[in-house]
Amino acid sequence: YGLFVCLLLWGGSELCCPQPLWFWQGGTRQPAPSVTPVVVECLEARLVVTVSRDLFGTGKLIQEADLSLGPEGCEPQASTDAVVRFEVGLHECGNSVQVTDDSLVYSSFLLHDPRPAGNLSILRTNRAEVPIECRYPRQGNVSSRAILPTWVPFWTTVLSEERLVFSLRLMEENWSREKMSPTFHLGDTAHLQAEVRTGSHPPLLLFVDRCVATPTRDQSGSPYHTIVDLHGCLVDGLSDGASKFKAPRPKPDVLQFMVAVFHFANDSRHTVYITCHLRVIPAQQAPDRLNKACSFNQSSSSWAPVEGSADICECCGNGDCDLIAGSPMNQNHAARSSLRSRRHVTEEADVTVGPLIFLGKAGDPAGTEGLASAAQATLVLGLRMATIVFLAVAAVVLGLTRGRHAASHPRSASQ
């Protein structure tokens, strides 16, 4: 009798008995079927709730019209004789979202609000509210799409894209290490290595877009000599076959090239600075007329790329490589000034190596004079810098001495 009253009041067995109810069927004692009444699926951007029509496990099936989802009371999308199904967006039906230290929590509820059937004024099931919650990690990937193998979260990848470090270095003849001495004789070949440090960035392919040589660090100064132009054409190779790109590359983010040593006529400084505009593209992108590394072969009078099809170098001969502007790029002062005026973005940068000191031919007295002149200029610059540093240190020491002297001999109020 007590169990019967409890069932009428609460409409369920779990509140009335500490153990599951057992019933008799066909003369044998069997446990009630253990069917999960509510199944929740938390998808990438949607919420799926499947409700058993035997919601209370009593054998009394609920009506589809008595079920709703969320504060806005969304109706079911599908139903069968056994289940009722909801499928909504995470932000729909008035669902709430909460941000914790490590999760995004979407909360909603399933409401069963029975109505009297027909003209009857009685209910055989109770009103019930089932809380629903979906948790998503804030530092993970919840997409069903494949993850690109950067192996870092998206925000880290974005930061690493802003930290590309471009460099241009003078190397030994065997490319094994950086050349420590900046001196050359006429007839030598300078070995230059352009490189970009990519960090956690996806693989990149580096190109030397343009290079210009000047006697000072001012890349727009005069006189000047163009080494690379037209988006990767090593035009210095037209006058000396030793000037060319090295193929194949050691790595996609490294590009090496040789330049036959020269000096500027009627210039007593015997120094040269080389400024190059470097740029990168995704490694999977094929080289084209705007992204290439082409050398001139004097024996065959033709241009050849380090990689890519041969036709991308054809424009080096006729000068129409600049597809964006729609016109050939002239080797003039304006073209060299664009090295400095172009916007510095993460995919490109200007880098300078120098000064390279040229001594003339080996054993040439004129070369010794040039070395003495260059060394004298370097010595004068060093002495000036040392004098400035000495004066600055002396001023700081003098100020500290005066401060300590004043602190150790304070004046009285009467004085």
From Swiss-Prot:
Side Cytoplasmic, residues: 400-415
Glycosylation sites: T28, N119, N141, T150, T156, T157, N174, N266, N297
Transmembrane segments: 379-399
Domain named ZP: residues: 41-301
Listed InterPro entries: ZP-C, ZP-C_dom, ZP-N, ZP_chr, ZP_dom, ZP_dom_CS
Post-translational modification: Proteolytically cleaved before the transmembrane segment to yield the secreted ectodomain incorporated in the zona pellucida. N-glycosylated.
Disulfide bonds: C42-C134, C74-C93, C211-C276, C233-C294
Cell compartments where the protein resides: Cell membrane
Propeptide positions: 342-415
Bilayer topology: Single-pass type I membrane protein
Gene Ontology molecular function, alphabetical: acrosin binding; carbohydrate binding; receptor ligand activity; structural constituent of egg coat
Ranges facing Extracellular side: 19-378
Record-linked PROSITE patterns: ZP_1, ZP_2
Main location: membrane
Tissue: Expressed in oocytes (at protein level).
Keyword field: Cell membrane, Cleavage on pair of basic residues, Disulfide bond, Extracellular matrix, Fertilization, Glycoprotein, Membrane, Pyrrolidone carboxylic acid, Receptor, Secreted, Signal, Transmembrane, Transmembrane helix
UniProt similarity note: Belongs to the ZP domain family. ZPC subfamily.
PANTHER family with a match to the protein in the record: ZONA PELLUCIDA SPERM-BINDING PROTEIN 3 (PTHR11576:SF2)
Main function: Component of the zona pellucida, an extracellular matrix surrounding oocytes which mediates sperm binding, induction of the acrosome reaction and prevents post-fertilization polyspermy. The zona pellucida is composed of 3 to 4 glycoproteins, ZP1, ZP2, ZP3, and ZP4. ZP3 is essential for sperm binding and zona matrix formation.
Assembly notes: Polymers of ZP2 and ZP3 organized into long filaments cross-linked by ZP1 homodimers. Interacts with ZP1 and ZP2.
Name the UniProt record assigns to this protein: Zona pellucida sperm-binding protein 3
Organism (species): Oryctolagus cuniculus
